[in-house]
């Protein structure tokens, strides 16, 4: 009986131990309940053994492969054996310089800025070299073409534009980059670029000037000992679109040159030049600058034919022409860089301004001499009594400012030669004092003064146009 009870108690303990073991397996932290192995899967014991082997190697977790983060190679990349070579080094490292040929096709010359002294150009830049590491077997000897994704995995020349301000590779609709590899390892690398580069301009003959600008291409890291940069086909390496045109310039010539550039810290580099010559269209500036300035000068000459006593007419005319010339000069300089030398357009505008200003000074001189003359006439009337048979009160009307109607009130008297009323006083005085020697001397002095006053306007009508025409002949013969 005791043996039976002990057996029951042992069975109960075994059952209770099995229950506890099952619960600990299901709820123990960090453990995982494995489903029964499916058909074709590894047995649970075998997977646990692999897990234990990983722990034996000292790693708390399962180790990953060293290149698990790498993107899988495409078939073409496997054919080129991308992973078999170190493409951070140039081809033939340690040997002679690798030749890299370049050709360029200019698509457009977008803008020329005189204020910023730069130009913007869009072009196709193509590089040619040979990298035997990229050679591949081919039964039909056909090349393979890739987009820009392969460029990041192989060696390409590190070209840059010297003196460039801004540049970018076009990316519509995708990156405009092409890579073509031939079976023998020859590579063509082409990209479409827009670059804004500096251009040193000389405006001493502006706007009758001709400018020469250059786009310079150079390797950034490789000296001439590592990379030999050259134009692949000489001058034929540069192609341009026949439809290229600019609003203000005529493109005269495109040509290429090659030079060496020296940097004191790194050495000598091959540099390629794309040179182009621009001649400015003059017709726009003839209409906007030269023609208005010439009209203002000619308009200032109109005052020479206006009566010298018409102050309200001559003074505003002179001031208007001076202010207009100032506006023209300011407008031209606003669209130009602030250079420290005189431009050709400055010479023309400032000489025209001087002519306009001299016409104002000419009237100032005429008006001053007329005022002095009238003052002397007034003094002469005070000294000479009128004996022309006219009533004494009418003598007060013989002032320099009387009108034709007032002259007709002088008893119907008019001079024989039909002179203007401004000479009436002298004629009447001379008629009454004809026999006096003293009056004859005064008459000669007065007539001489009158002739000199009229001569200023008279001679200005000839001297000013003749001098301006002479200036134009000299100016256009020098700068055209």
Swiss-Prot record:
Main location: membrane
Membrane-side (Cytoplasmic) residue stretches: 303-314, 368-458
Compartments, record wording: Postsynaptic cell membrane; Cell membrane
Disordered: region residues: 29-67
Biased composition (Basic residues): 39-48
Activity: how regulated: Inhibited by TPMPA, a rho-specific antagonist, when forming a homopentamer. In contrast with other GABAARs, rho-1 GABAAR is not inhibited by bicuculline when forming a homopentamer.
Disulfide bonds: 199-213
GO CC, one annotated term: chloride channel complex
Spans traversing the lipid bilayer: 282-302, 315-335, 347-367, 459-479
Stretches of the chain found on the membrane's Extracellular side: 22-281, 336-346, 480
Position of the signal peptide: 1-21
Pfam family, one: Neur_chan_LBD
Glycosylation sites: 141, 235, 275
GO molecular function ontology, one term from the record: GABA-A receptor activity
Reactions mediated catalytically: chloride(in) = chloride(out)
Membrane topology: Multi-pass membrane protein
Highest rank taxon of the organism: Eukaryota
GO biological process, one term: modulation of chemical synaptic transmission
Tissue-specificity statement: Expressed in the cerebellum.
Composition skew (Basic and acidic residues), residue ranges: 29-38
Keyword set, alphabetical order: Cell membrane, Chloride, Chloride channel, Disulfide bond, Glycoprotein, Ion channel, Ion transport, Membrane, Postsynaptic cell membrane, Signal, Synapse, Transmembrane, Transmembrane helix, Transport
Similarity comment: family membership: Belongs to the ligand-gated ion channel (TC 1.A.9) family. Gamma-aminobutyric acid receptor (TC 1.A.9.5) subfamily. GABRR1 sub-subfamily.
Function description: Rho subunit of the pentameric ligand-gated chloride channels responsible for mediating the effects of gamma-aminobutyric acid (GABA), the major inhibitory neurotransmitter in the brain. Rho-containing GABA-gated chloride channels are a subclass of GABA(A) receptors (GABAARs) entirely composed of rho subunits, where GABA molecules bind at the rho intersubunit interfaces. When activated by GABA, rho-GABAARs selectively allow the flow of chloride anions across the cell membrane down their electrochemical gradient.
Domain notes: GABAARs subunits share a common topological structure: a peptide sequence made up of a long extracellular N-terminal, four transmembrane domains, intracellular or cytoplasmic domain located between the third and the fourth transmembrane domains.
Oligomer status and interactors: Three rho subunits (rho-1/GBRR1, rho-2/GBRR2 and rho-3/GBRR3) coassemble either to form functional homopentamers or heteropentamers. Rho-1/GBRR1 subunits can also associate with alpha-1/GBRA1 subunits to form a functional GABAAR. Interacts with SQSTM1.
Protein name as annotated: Gamma-aminobutyric acid receptor subunit rho-1
Organism: Mus musculus
Lineage: Eukaryota, Metazoa, Chordata, Craniata, Vertebrata
